Amino acid sequence: MIPPSYIGRFAPSPSGSLHFGSLVAALGSYLRAHSQQGQWLVRIEDIDPPREVPGASDNILRTLDAYGLHWHGTVLFQQQRYQVYQDQIEAFIASDLAYYCQCTRKIIQTSGGVYDGRCGRLQPRLTHGAIRIRNHVKVDHFVDKLQGPVVVDKAFAEEDFIIKRSDGLYAYQLAVVLDDAYQGITEVVRGCDLLEASCRQISLFTQLEFTPPDWLHLPLVCAEKGFKLSKQNYAPAIDVIHPQASINAALTFLGQKAVDVDSVEVMLKQAVEQFDLSTIPAQKEIVLSTIND
């Protein structure tokens, strides 16, 4: 069997129910993958147990199913991958490519707000604390398929960033890179809240000698300027009983033509057939009230 040339994914965290912003990200990545005759995977990013809501993972998967957003293969849960993350961290430390750091946010703020690598220069080495990667591949720009050229602050790009937190939890940057590489993701389609983080992920991909995926960052759904819909600010869950209206609303948000109201499977088939990347607004955020203005 010839492997697909395109593999995309939707990777929500189980911190609550899917809301309209989640639907936009899920639908955008689904349409992009299927328009490329590719695969669309689902991964549950459950590496932050204190923020998890009991039952949220099952609720998310049921909601995707109710919307006809059926995934290829089995769902990957990041908690299944803890040993992989730990093995990579230990390999980094053994090669002096990572080190322990005990600097607090207050210490970093008093030294200009950017971590200066001081713990990486200590002798003898620290043996506990957060763990930072030695950032030997400094990435301060990349080209996004929708947003175009993206440039981040040089100090941010050069910083040795955390790959395991001081509380023992694995950092998102490490987990997402190892998982995207493991699943063979060829393009990451997600919201613009992670636009700058892509530079750190490209850095990690390169240091690990993996080929970075392409990047396509969708505009964020905002209730008002600078205030995105999120589970943390109690954005309402999307309707799983009558999903058709929400599907067309999400298509409109993404600059796509509405589809005929039918079963969700028929609606998504039509949406894939008429999907046009060039009509998605190349904006970092869109306030909901302005869509039909």
UniProtKB/Swiss-Prot annotation:
EC number in record: 6.1.1.-
InterPro entries: Glu-Q_tRNA(Asp)_Synthase (IPR022380), Glu/Gln-tRNA-synth (IPR000924), Glu/Gln-tRNA-synth_Ib_cat-dom (IPR020058), GluQ/Sye (IPR049940), Rossmann-like_a/b/a_fold (IPR014729)
Keywords of the record: Aminoacyl-tRNA synthetase, ATP-binding, Ligase, Metal-binding, Nucleotide-binding, Zinc
Pfam families for this protein: tRNA-synt_1c
Enzyme class: ligase
GO molecular function: ATP binding; glutamate-tRNA ligase activity; zinc ion binding
Cofactor note text: Binds 1 zinc ion per subunit.
GO biological process: glutamyl-tRNA aminoacylation; tRNA modification
Keyword Transport appears in the UniProt entry: no
Transcription regulation found in the keyword field: no
Motif ('KMSKS' region): 228-232
Superkingdom assignment: Bacteria
Binding sites annotated in the UniProt record for ATP: K231
Record-listed Zn(2+) binding positions: C101, C103, Y115, C119
NCBIfam families reported in the protein's UniProt record: PRK05710.1-3 (NF004314), queuosine_YadB (TIGR03838)
Entry function: Catalyzes the tRNA-independent activation of glutamate in presence of ATP and the subsequent transfer of glutamate onto a tRNA(Asp). Glutamate is transferred on the 2-amino-5-(4,5-dihydroxy-2-cyclopenten-1-yl) moiety of the queuosine in the wobble position of the QUC anticodon.
PANTHER family: GLUTAMATE--TRNA LIGASE, GLUTAMYL-Q TRNA(ASP) SYNTHETASE
Protein name (record): Glutamyl-Q tRNA(Asp) synthetase
Annotated source species: Shewanella frigidimarina (strain NCIMB 400)
